[in-house]
Amino acid sequence: MGVNKALIKQAVKQILVAIGEDPEREGLRRTPDRVANMLEELTNGREENVQYTLFEGSSNMVIVAGIRFSTLCEHHLLPMLGVTHVAYIPSDKVIGVSKIPRIVVKYSRMLQLQERLTRQIMNEVSSATGSGDVMVLTEAYHTCMMIRGVRSASPLVSMAYKGKFNDSSLRLEFLEYIRPFRLNKFLT
């Protein structure tokens, strides 16, 4: 199911009129095109097909930390900006290091809830690696919360984990490792 850019353009023009703007005035004339192109880019994750190649690995924890992402909140269609940290314990093989950020991009390129995004990344990493031992921590600023309503710039942190990461000492080891890559240090 692709993006219907013509319908988006028509809807954006109607929104501009509904808020008292003239969609034909200078500065807004190309806004419907820009919004349609933006939404096409930011919601094409369902079309992503990440190919995985497995390599010889070890049984030690693999961590990819500080993966920057942006996605749109499905409630307000406003951006969430954040970082994701992923760890897994290989069963005996590992996937290429670039594949984990690709998984993050795949699921962030659709309308999202942060908690669902975190679970989807965990499940895809588990499926791709064949590991039942995966942990994902996602931190994000929600612009819907920053610019409207409560107007708070507090980030949301969500975690999903399974397998050996149910052991709190392993979670703490992961959290200690990713500390330098956490959102408050990484996006500033």
From Swiss-Prot:
<comment type="pathway">
    <text>Cofactor biosynthesis; 7,8-dihydroneopterin triphosphate biosynthesis; 7,8-dihydroneopterin triphosphate from GTP: step 1/1.</text>
</comment>
<keyword id="KW-0554">One-carbon metabolism</keyword>
<dbReference type="GO" id="GO:0003934">
    <property type="term" value="F:GTP cyclohydrolase I activity"/>
</dbReference>
<keyword id="KW-0479">Metal-binding</keyword>
<keyword id="KW-0378">Hydrolase</keyword>
<dbReference type="InterPro" id="IPR020602">
    <property type="entry name" value="GTP_CycHdrlase_I_dom"/>
</dbReference>
<protein>
    <recommendedName>
        <fullName>GTP cyclohydrolase 1</fullName>
        <ecNumber>3.5.4.16</ecNumber>
    </recommendedName>
</protein>
<comment type="similarity">
    <text>Belongs to the GTP cyclohydrolase I family.</text>
</comment>
<dbReference type="GO" id="GO:0046654">
    <property type="term" value="P:tetrahydrofolate biosynthetic process"/>
</dbReference>
<dbReference type="InterPro" id="IPR001474">
    <property type="entry name" value="GTP_CycHdrlase_I"/>
</dbReference>
<keyword id="KW-0547">Nucleotide-binding</keyword>
<dbReference type="GO" id="GO:0005737">
    <property type="term" value="C:cytoplasm"/>
</dbReference>
<dbReference type="Pfam" id="PF01227">
    <property type="entry name" value="GTP_cyclohydroI"/>
</dbReference>
<dbReference type="GO" id="GO:0005525">
    <property type="term" value="F:GTP binding"/>
</dbReference>
<feature type="binding site">
    <location>
        <position position="76"/>
    </location>
    <ligand>
        <name>Zn(2+)</name>
    </ligand>
</feature>
<dbReference type="InterPro" id="IPR043133">
    <property type="entry name" value="GTP-CH-I_C/QueF"/>
</dbReference>
<feature type="binding site">
    <location>
        <position position="73"/>
    </location>
    <ligand>
        <name>Zn(2+)</name>
    </ligand>
</feature>
<dbReference type="InterPro" id="IPR043134">
    <property type="entry name" value="GTP-CH-I_N"/>
</dbReference>
<comment type="subunit">
    <text>Homomer.</text>
</comment>
<dbReference type="GO" id="GO:0006729">
    <property type="term" value="P:tetrahydrobiopterin biosynthetic process"/>
</dbReference>
<keyword id="KW-0862">Zinc</keyword>
<dbReference type="GO" id="GO:0008270">
    <property type="term" value="F:zinc ion binding"/>
</dbReference>
<feature type="binding site">
    <location>
        <position position="144"/>
    </location>
    <ligand>
        <name>Zn(2+)</name>
    </ligand>
</feature>
<keyword id="KW-0342">GTP-binding</keyword>
<dbReference type="GO" id="GO:0006730">
    <property type="term" value="P:one-carbon metabolic process"/>
</dbReference>
